[in-house]
Amino acid sequence: VISKYLKTLMDLGIVTKEIPITEKPGKKTIYLLEDNFFRFWYRFVPINSNAIDSGRMEKIYPKAVKQNFSDYMGLTFEKMCKDYLLYYAESLPIELRQIGKWWGTDSRRKKQIQIDIVGTPVNGQEYLIGSCKYRNEKIGLDELTLLQEYASVFGKGSKYHYFIFSKGGFT
């Protein structure tokens, strides 16, 4: 049972509840700040409040905000990529039932993994598996290899269609 405060934040659209796309609600539930203003505020303002109050923000901005901005934008970029796939859903190789993310444990490596985008099929065992990278650097084939490894850990489908989104482009 969630607290009344968390429920209120969810009702206001400030917080959202996420579970891995193919899982039933339970232990793997996480709560995220959905509202971009609140995400920015709580990511950058409290930790830099002294610099802001004393007028030094312009001087420390490159290290305090700019250096961490790509990490901050990652969640927003993931949403944009999901929206892109939904917009072009009719031209995708499968008919989507839903789209979300998935996380779990790679038992071979004993580490947590996350797949940014998983599209579940209306029929069959074909899934969309996607990665979203909001970085200035170009990404290479190693990202596809990693995504294929993650798909094998996900293990729900018999066939996967891979989509990789990159702000910086590809090598």
Please give the residue ranges for each predicted region:
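Short amphipathic alpha-helical interaction segments
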Residues: 1-13
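Glycine-rich, charged/polar anion/phosphate-binding loops
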Residues: 2, 16-18, 104
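A short, conserved structural fragment
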Residues: 10-22
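A cross-kingdom feature that marks ATP-driven nucleic-acid transaction machinery
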Residues: 21, 29-171
